[in-house]
């Protein structure tokens, strides 16, 4: 069974990690995927992999902190595949890691732009296209940082990721009645470049009840659930995929 047959999905941050795994999985589940990242070479490699496996894919290089990037993504979904049903607003950045009193204002703005403003810009562009199709599903990649735990030097990142939950709830209040489900995926530690070196990954594993970090594919499966008909009555929710961190913190 293909859960996303004939659906069209936008996935940002798709050149590596959770975004790459999500793009591959969604394409395997029948969706046409419009993928985005800033790095052209890595993004094109993902697109080639999907195409070689028989998937439908189109790559759009761009910075999700800019409104025009999201407009181009939505337009590509319409032009190439006929519309938009699903968006996984996954792109983000940890930003500078330092105590809040030492954080320059420009770094604060950079971190919020990469993680929160980018999500707002994405949803603002995506909602009208979904309404034209009678509904859809939006998934934001948040984090256990800021929602379940605070980590040293990551106040800006945690604030941005926690604020995504306010965006999820507000969008749900506005658009659930019109058929758009909006939810957040909250990963714990994940085996990606963002997680750091082996020592940092081992430290992160200790934060979880399962005493390990996730693979990107495990998070992609959670995103698939939220985007698919399996979650047809799930709206305005936070799905912790954190290896039990929230249960034992």
PLM region spans:
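Conserved glycine-rich cofactor-binding loop
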Residues: 8, 15-16
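Short C-terminal tail/terminal secondary-structure segment
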Residues: 94-97, 224, 235-249
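Substrate-binding pocket helix/loop in short-chain dehydrogenase/reductase
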Residues: 98-100, 107-112, 204
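Active-site helix of classical SDR
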Residues: 123, 160, 168
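Alpha-helical segment proximal to the catalytic Tyr-Lys
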Residues: 128, 147, 169, 173-174, ...
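Short, small/polar-rich loop/turn modules that mediate ligand/substrate recognition or access, typified
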Residues: 176, 181, 234-236
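A conserved structural motif in NAD(P)-dependent oxidoreductases
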Residues: 208-219, 230
